[in-house]
Amino acid sequence: MQGLPTIILVGPMGAGKSTIGRLLAAELQREFFDSDHEIEARCGANIAWIFDVEGEAGFRDRETAMLRELASLDAVVLATGGGAVMREDNRQALRERGTVVYLATSVEQQIRRTARDRNRPLLRQGNPEQVLRDLFAKRDPLYRATADLVVRTDRRGPRAVVNEIIRRTKRLSDPLDLKA
């Protein structure tokens, strides 16, 4: 689908950024990139290992470099890591390069979606529910401040979310298009 800008998905772990991003890219006939997967491919190691060896600050440095690179591409769909909005440089780069969509979800939904995932380093730091609640309190305002659109994902299928993103992004791109 021509005419739509790069679409950048932000939101917490378990919001569906990767799943929705892949479907959205296929629907729009665009390339899809997941910044966390790109970091893993480039490093030859998973995120948990990078956190263990370099700490969160080391990972965030890699993430910032990767986001700059991926956000510079034209007309792609980009799924970011949940903590990408923690740095102002990242928020600014994302806002400047495309339409930012916050995939908002409840902590309860996050718990259901991440319960068996062992590759989430931040969830290994104590009670996962409390960690998710603390992350939500810190990050939700940043997601909202960065986003052009907020789309809820709770109790919705990925296809319905994709359709809403396309419809609302078209409306943002051309507010006079009455069919959008």
Curated annotation (Swiss-Prot):
ATP binds at G14, A15, G16, K17, S18, T19, R120. Its main location: cytoplasm. Substrate binds at D36, R60, G82, R139. It comes from the Bacteria. The keyword Transferase applies. It is found in: Cytoplasm. It is an enzyme of class 2 (transferase). GO terms for biological process: amino acid biosynthetic process; aromatic amino acid family biosynthetic process; chorismate biosynthetic process. SUPFAM superfamilies: P-loop containing nucleoside triphosphate hydrolases. Binds 1 Mg(2+) ion per subunit. Its cofactor is Mg(2+). Keywords: Amino-acid biosynthesis, Aromatic amino acid biosynthesis, ATP-binding, Cytoplasm, Kinase, Magnesium, Metal-binding, Nucleotide-binding, Transferase. PANTHER family: SHIKIMATE KINASE (PTHR21087), SHIKIMATE KINASE 1, CHLOROPLASTIC (PTHR21087:SF16). Belongs to the shikimate kinase family. Catalyzes the specific phosphorylation of the 3-hydroxyl group of shikimic acid using ATP as a cosubstrate. Monomer. This is Shikimate kinase. It comes from Chromohalobacter salexigens (strain ATCC BAA-138 / DSM 3043 / CIP 106854 / NCIMB 13768 / 1H11).
